[in-house]
């Protein structure tokens, strides 16, 4: 059997994640300031749902009456946490590997626009590079997702949609878990005109359940494997207009975090390399919450799901409560 390195979960309940704060132009805004945050950290799994735009539905979001000012051409940081009260050492379960992405949509009123429908364009993506996933980079960075705001887009109000996709159960259709929230921002210092990227996209509509970046067995991948990031190509400013030429393809990925970009280094617990399946053991009557891991190769946490959920096998490496 192929030797596998299995990341140990710190807690069965620490699986999910929320975009809770935005840092812009040196200011870290309070939790939920200018962001439509939910009280529950569950995923969206139906890529045809309107909830794919800015979350909601199974994870009801709370409106915010704040808009955050962001300079065109600057780098902002979407700050991710397991819950609204978690710290930098509790971002997302390390087993939840996948890409990170960010999109912008120009709107008339960032406070009231639902985000549903057209007008979206991708401005950030980090997929898989030499064995490193975008989500792992965010965890290593203490929850920071670095997002460059294009310098060439018009000033005005936008929705900034930050997203992390977990692929641990994505070997079957609708197994990918998508996490996203929308920040309400006002971009200043942009171009004086009204031109936007020539092509924009609709959410829902940017993904299909059968996209190779959403229907994939990550456990069969090697460090040299190629991964196709979901969604359209990333927008970049034309040469001589605040950025590099053209729009990048989505089959290449951003480099993993380096010591110069890490805000905080968080060491992930790693189990000993295993060459055989270890049967999970009961853990004193504990129960796992909805969407939490409850089984899989090398797993030794809670194997009983809280009522009314049951433990369902997604693949040999991951079972979850649903």
Swiss-Prot record:
It catalyses: [(1->4)-beta-D-glucosyl]n+m + reduced acceptor + O2 = 4-dehydro-beta-D-glucosyl-[(1->4)-beta-D-glucosyl]n-1 + [(1->4)-beta-D-glucosyl]m + acceptor + H2O. InterPro entries: AA9 (IPR049892), AA9_LPMO (IPR005103), CBD_sf (IPR035971), Cellulose-bd_dom_fun (IPR000254). GO terms for molecular function: cellulose binding; metal ion binding; monooxygenase activity. Cu(2+) binds at residues 16, 96. Gene3D superfamilies: 2.70.50.70. Keywords: Carbohydrate metabolism, Cellulose degradation, Copper, Disulfide bond, Glycoprotein, Metal-binding, Monooxygenase, Oxidoreductase, Polysaccharide degradation, Secreted, Signal. It is found in: Secreted. It comes from the Eukaryota. Binds 1 copper ion per subunit. SMART domains: fCBD. Lignocellulose is the most abundant polymeric composite on Earth and is a recalcitrant but promising renewable substrate for industrial biotechnology applications. Together with cellobiose dehydrogenases (CDHs) an enzymatic system capable of oxidative cellulose cleavage is formed, which increases the efficiency of cellulases and put LPMOs at focus of biofuel research. GO terms for biological process: cellulose catabolic process. Has a modular structure: an endo-beta-1,4-glucanase catalytic module at the N-terminus, a linker rich in serines and threonines, and a C-terminal carbohydrate-binding module (CBM). The CBM domain is essential for binding to and subsequent oxidative degradation of polysaccharide substrate. Lytic polysaccharide monooxygenase (LPMO) that depolymerizes crystalline and amorphous polysaccharides via the oxidation of scissile alpha- or beta-(1-4)-glycosidic bonds, yielding C4 oxidation products. Catalysis by LPMOs requires the reduction of the active-site copper from Cu(II) to Cu(I) by a reducing agent and H(2)O(2) or O(2) as a cosubstrate. Active on tamarind xyloglucan and konjac glucomannan. This is AA9 family lytic polysaccharide monooxygenase A. It comes from Neurospora crassa (strain ATCC 24698 / 74-OR23-1A / CBS 708.71 / DSM 1257 / FGSC 987). The gene is gh61-1.
């Amino acid at each position: 059997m192929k030797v596998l390195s299995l990341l140990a979960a710190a807690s069965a309940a620490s699986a999910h994640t929320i975009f809770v704060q935005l840092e812009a132009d040196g200011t870290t805004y309070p939790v939920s300031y200018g962001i439509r945050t939910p009280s529950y950290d569950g995923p969206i799994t139906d890529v045809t749902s309107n909830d794919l735009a800015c979350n909601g539905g199974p994870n009801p979001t709370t409106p915010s009456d704040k808009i955050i000012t962001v300079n065109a051409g600057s780098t902002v940081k979407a700050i991710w946490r397991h819950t609204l009260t978690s710290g930098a050492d509790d971002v997302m379960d390390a087993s939840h590997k996948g890409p990170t992405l960010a999109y912008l949509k120009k709107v008339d009123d960032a406070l009231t626009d639902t985000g549903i429908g057209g007008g979206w364009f991708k401005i950030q993506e980090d997929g898989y590079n030499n064995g490193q996933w975008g989500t792992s980079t965010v965890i290593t960075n203490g929850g920071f997702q670095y997002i460059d705001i294009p310098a060439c887009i018009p000033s005005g109000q936008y929705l900034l949609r930050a997203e992390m996709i977990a692929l641990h159960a994505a070997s079957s259709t609708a197994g990918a878990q998508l996490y996203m929230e929308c920040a309400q921002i006002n971009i200043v210092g942009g171009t004086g005109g009204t031109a936007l990227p020539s092509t924009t996209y609709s959410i829902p509509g940017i993904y299909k359940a059968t996209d190779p970046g959403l229907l994939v067995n990550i456990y069969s991948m090697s460090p040299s494997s190629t991964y196709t990031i979901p969604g359209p190509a990333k927008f970049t400013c034309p040469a001589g207009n605040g950025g590099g030429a053209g729009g990048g393809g989505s089959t290449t990925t951003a480099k993993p975090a380096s010591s110069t970009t890490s805000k905080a280094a968080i060491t992930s617990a790693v189990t000993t390399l295993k060459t055989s399946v270890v049967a999970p053991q009961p853990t004193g009557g504990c129960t796992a919450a909805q969407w939490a891991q409850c089984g899989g190769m090398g797993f030794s946490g809670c194997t009983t799901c809280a009522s009314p959920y049951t433990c369902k096998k997604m693949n040999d490496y991951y079972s979850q409560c649903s």
